[in-house]
Amino acid sequence: VVSPTPDPSPPINATARADATVIPTASRPIVTPATPTTEPGTTQVVKHGVPELASASLAGVRLVGGTLTLDQNTGGYPQSGTITSGEIATPFAFDTLVPSWNATAPTGTSLRCEIRVRANGTRSGWYVLGNWSASQRGSVSNQRDSIGSVDVDTLKLNLPAQAFQYRFTLISADPKQTPSLRLVAVNYASLRDGLRGPAVSPAPGWFRDLPVPVQSQLLQTANLAWDVCSPTSLAMVLQYWKIPASVPEVISGVRDQTNGIYGNWPFNTAFAGRQGLEAYVNRFTSMVELQNEIAASRPVVTSIRFAAGELANAPITSTSGHLLVVRGFTANGDVIVNDPVAPNLAEVRRVYQRAQFANVWLRHGGVAYQIRQA
């Protein structure tokens, strides 16, 4: 359904990912995108902090203490308010989009993330990319129209789009409580022909191994063990940043209750954001970008996929989707990881060949959780 109005379009059917680790198949003024963090022409991220959010169209929302909250009045907080960006033109046509946010939503409150796009002059309806709070969160199924569809956390387009717009609705059932929003990041990419950029760039010429604590997903509750690579990886990175989040706590805090999965990418980064970190989903196009994060002492959660024989020294033979932590590089450029699917803690830290890792990561979208101190 294509609608020029700001009202949410009818639910647009997307097949949800089967488990937590499967990678998805791949009249306000225009806002200038933020400086790209990756090579132009393939994928970029627009990151809006409080200054950009405060300059968006606000309805029932105000800036308070460095975050956007519901606009309190004498009767308390209203039931809802919206933050709507201007239409953001992109320097290249894109076919895939993943939004992220850093927010808080105490008991009785929540937020909704929506995206719409302009494709060849036609504006889509609003697609819901998540309903989120600290205690309840879920993706929205059955969203499909002629322009695109939602696959859990990812907007996939049938037509190339040249612009997008986001809208966040802050919701409260308690007049004494409000959610707050401090960061929105939107990654968009053209994936039909794969990400351009060097698959294997030169080795960094230095050795670095960040002291990321080790955790194994296979030590978790048996019925969850094979489904929780993402929260286990996230827990390792949070512990690196001195946030005492246990693996079970993170598992509970990222679960997509609509699909019963734990690998909803924005829900994982939102959990990190709720701990006071800056965290969002991005895509990289080369190993150099990954090296830059390690050089800045920032471990990265990456999403990989591989068939038998494609990744030597892995604890498993193959996977249709898996997340792990990149913690460093050897002197010859190989990749040091914490792989959560290792059977015990002693085997979590591993080294993967540089070319093989680049192939199983970048060839399948280069997805990364970028997590840093705010």
Predicted regions and their residues:
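Tryptophan-centered motif/residue detector
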Residues: 101, 125-126, 224, 264-266, ...
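Short loop/turn segments at secondary-structure transitions that flank enzyme active sites
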Residues: 105, 119-121, 172, 235, ...
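Conserved active-site-adjacent core of cysteine acyl-enzyme catalytic domains
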Residues: 244-374
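Short intrinsically disordered, low-complexity coil segments enriched in acidic
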Residues: 1-9, 85, 102
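Ser/Thr-rich, Proline-interspersed low-complexity disordered segments
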Residues: 3-39
